[in-house]
Amino acid sequence: MKELLANRVKTLTPSTTLAITAKAKEMKAQGIDVIGLGAGEPDFNTPQNIMDAAIDSMQQGYTKYTPSGGLPALKQAIIEKFKRDNQLEYKPNEIIVGVGAKHVLYTLFQVILNEGDEVIIPIPYWVSYPEQVKLAGGVPVYIEATSEQNYKITAEQLKNAITDKTKAVIINSPSNPTGMVYTREELEDIAKIALENNILIVSDEIYEKLLYNGAEHFSIAQISEEVKAQTIVINGVSKSHSMTGWRIGYAAGNADIINAMTDLASHSTSNPTTASQYAAIEAYNGPQDSVEEMRKAFESRLETIYPKLSAIPGFKVVKPQGAFYLLPDVSEAAQKTGFASVDEFASALLTEANVAVIPGSGFGAPSTIRISYATSLNLIEEAIERIDRFVK
């Protein structure tokens, strides 16, 4: 029989986050008391008014195809959101709605990358960036942002990484997995290098609404019209409105790129789920109280978990400013407990301490683990106690 699989998928690395989450769920199904700190989604239910909007749309018969790039009403809601939150002006032909921000990113790389084009990715990175770039024929080029620099790349690092094959750089702020937020000044320095070298900026802003202790979100596209023209902004309702399962994300930027993405989407998904689009319209046009309530809950959890995690022997923790993750360096704790690697340490936490965390190797940071505080405070505190006992 001929080889069944294409070469391009043979080097794919399965999503670490989804794999650990699945293993934890499997253990729970066996009756094991597992506490999951690996979740990449809010633990709150979608607000009722948003669910009602989806139900109403179906009852009114809105169950057919929509335009491939999204409902005009949803595009308009997104345009108003950009005006309100980011002081950015976009036209409908500069917006595409897709099946979650992940799929929007995938579609973007498919339409902008030729074989061998390079995309600069800061380390630590979200697990899907390198895989999506490779699937589009691109080459990931990594810049390591250390804990000493708060896990944020510098303009000088970016400048040194650019070659004649560089097509784009990814900026994720607030960041998954670090929770760090770039300042306006840092983004201005990065944008200057991108403009000088004529490379596209891919700005992933999905955690925009989850900011703590006075941190402020600033979109790199806000710097100037020139920067905006060279930036594709990625966002969605998954994290801000606790709608991960609804699968609605979007991109805003250059009309030619957006048009190409829309053409590709017409052959891959037809359109995002119709009811989900109506739910997203309500998410942006309806009351925003729940967004702030969820943010406050995450902030409260962070203030509880950070000092306790920092007190565990061998844990070095940089306090995050956004998202709902911490990324402690636990190499010392792993060594202290007799493990050859942090991956083995993380695996033992699951099988022996019944706490699920994500090994940092999946994010390009093998000395770390990612801990999510998108779960109840009681469970978080119990999980930290288990980790503390395990290490001691």
Swiss-Prot record:
It comes from the Bacteria. SUPFAM superfamilies: PLP-dependent transferases. InterPro entries: Aminotransferase_I/II_large (IPR004839), AspAT/PAT-like (IPR050596), NHTrfase_class1_PyrdxlP-BS (IPR004838), PyrdxlP-dep_Trfase (IPR015424), PyrdxlP-dep_Trfase_major (IPR015421), PyrdxlP-dep_Trfase_small (IPR015422). Pfam families: Aminotran_1_2. One of its GO terms (biological process) is biosynthetic process. It catalyses: L-aspartate + 2-oxoglutarate = oxaloacetate + L-glutamate. The keyword Transferase applies. PANTHER family: ASPARTATE AMINOTRANSFERASE (PTHR46383:SF1). This is Aspartate aminotransferase.
